[in-house]
Amino acid sequence: MIDNDKTHFDAIVIGTGFAGIYMLHKLRNELGLKVRAFDKASGVGGTWYWNKYPGARADTESFVYRYSFDKETSEGWDWRNRYVDQPEMLGYLQAVVDRHGLAKDIQLKTGIDSAVFDEIHHIWTLTTSTGELFTARYLVNAVGVLSKIVIPQIPGRDKFQGQIVHTGAWPADLSLEGKRVGVIGTGSTGVQFICAASKLARHLTVFQRSAQFCVPAGSRQVSEAYVAEYKNNFEQIWDGIRNSRIACGFEESGVSAMSVSEEERQKVFEHHWEIGNGFRFMFGTFSDIAVDPAANQAASDFIRAKIRQIVKDPETARKLCPTDLYAKRPVCTNDYYETYNLPNVSLVSLPENPIKELTANGVLTEDGVEHKLDLLVFATGFETVEGSYNQMEIRGRGGETLQHHWKDAPSSYLGVATAGFPNMFMVLGPNSAFSNLPPSIESQVEWIGELIGWAEGESTPVIETTREAEEAWTATCKEIAAYTLFPKVKSWIFGENIDGRSSRVLFYFGGLAGYRAKLREVADADYEGFILHSDPSSMVA
């Protein structure tokens, strides 16, 4: 006999990273609902649980890569470095869980295989990887933007006698000491791993798929005075973050690059190069790096000049210089280009010399050279946004799967709901704000909580968005993206890191402040674009 007290909930949350932890707290502790959160991992942390690779750390500053809702934990947490590393990040998130007593309502080592909406009883039925069944009135997906790893298909994988790993599924006991290591990928993760691995491996071979614009991170230990200043100005700092575009805690420039002299531009670029941070360099130098070709060219030329200045071997420097626009997600780490001056580091440019196959001993490139390896690391990223959902079978009205609903491209209304899937919400769903993630997560969690709280007060069992609202939001996001330079470069932020997949808009590029204003506008209009009703058989408008 099923014990409904243990298997039925007001809400179920999938995921226990930044989004899932706060969502559980919001629904349980603030709204008083009966909630259970599930995670396939054996600990909380989401992407920060899985990404244990050497060098793993945030590339947004520590004081803003955290919650603002939990001032007490932040004030009691004296971080050591400008950028929090993976172990410290897990410690912080666990401290939040402990402070708010959330552990008793988190079920770990339990993935969700399916979620099906029952139109008669208007509840979600979930099947877990452990064979259990649970039901809930509300389903909140907090599964993350970057969860499902991507490993490119390379001939000969079954021949390789060494070890193959992905940075997003790093074994805790894996050491690089004394090993010949190869790495494919030079994105945000790749540059961090390369710099760390160069200090540990006997030899490191970097297989570069595309050259990367990388600025220094300015990583360093922070002083007690630095931490104290943040704590003393907590509210003011967070007010500025919420009312900014990128939400990274620095002053975003309002000056056009071409409105100043060449001498002044170089001074500004040099100043921000010395301070460090990728988002700061793109958005703190000038206001139009991401939208104006001339401004973008100026920034690109500056970084390319730095590469040629830093890298001693001219041929290596040539390979490291990007030839496209500076319009991918900004990347930063300390000493990236300096790493290629080390005697134990070599670079292979895959556009010029592709991988032919893996052999028993390593990687064979088209020039006939066999690069002998003990370990091959894929820093090749994730299936952005939709990958997390593709790992589950989610069925809404009429039995339609989410995969079918998103067959052309993932879409949503405001990044939080999709038509035909009543009482299902998403944190960081498709076309959420392109910004520092924790402030964006908080904005959505708080808004979803307000919507559910409002519906509970109205005794309304069903909340769903309309197709018209979803289509209009998708069109808005496409229009804003087209105004920027980002779509002009092949990148994971448009899902183009998946073989055979065409470009699709996955983010709202209008800034966090603009996004929050839209959320407030919709709420103030009695949640315009949503239908709240008691008839579960009602058709979506």
Curated annotation (Swiss-Prot):
Keywords: FAD, Flavoprotein, Monooxygenase, NADP, Oxidoreductase. SUPFAM superfamilies: FAD/NAD(P)-binding domain. It holds the Pfam family Pyr_redox_2. Its cofactor is FAD. It comes from the Bacteria. Disruption phenotype: Disappearance of all phenazine N-oxide products with significantly increased phenazine non-oxides. Exhibits some antibacterial activity toward E.coli and B.subtilis, but at a much lower level than the wild type. The record marks 329 as: Transition state stabilizer. GO terms for molecular function: cyclohexanone monooxygenase activity; FAD binding; NADP binding. One of its GO terms (biological process) is defense response to bacterium. The keyword NADP applies. Transmembrane segments: none annotated. NADP(+) binds at residues 57-59, 186-192, 209-210, 492. Its EC number is 1.14.-.-. Belongs to the FAD-binding monooxygenase family. PANTHER family: DUAL-FUNCTIONAL MONOOXYGENASE_METHYLTRANSFERASE PSOF, L-ORNITHINE N(5)-MONOOXYGENASE-RELATED. This is Phenazine N-monooxygenase PhzNO1. It comes from Lysobacter antibioticus.
